[in-house]
Amino acid sequence: HQLAIDPADIIKEYGEADLYLFRHAQRRCLYQEIAAVLEAKLDNEDLVKSQMEFYQRVGMPPYFGLYEMGCYIRKVNQVTIDFGLAWFEQVCKYSSRDQLSFPFVLWNFEDRLKVAILKGNCSKYIGTPFENEGNEYFTNHANHIK
């Protein structure tokens, strides 16, 4: 995806934030996503279960949020750099499914990181029981391929 509008317009609409995210189009919880990953056999079962058990053990709450990682906006500053490194560590240690580790790291950074939730979805082409209108902020690269 490619940004389709001036980032200043997004800041005007949502205010200053470190991350601008879309909610996940189908689920609202990390643990729901883990169940979906396990059911579809999208990653190593033992690894994903180990990740889930660790998150539960350290108190990761259910329904903290789940986000579409296909397109998001990140301000470049020290807190987002630290956030990105912590997220990368989780992806290296556990599942490479980025949506599994993102909410956990976000939870750990919630007192240092300001997040704005964008309206719509990352892609209007995803069939979902929730919102399905796409968004005005990004274009889909597939539309540009000839």
Model feature map: region roles:
Residues 21, 27-45, 123-128:
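Cell wall/extracellular polymer interaction/catalysis modules
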Residues 1-34:
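GT-A fold catalytic core of metal-dependent nucleotide-sugar glycosyltransferases
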Residues 43-145:
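Catalytic core and acceptor-binding pocket of nucleotide-sugar-dependent glycosyltransferases
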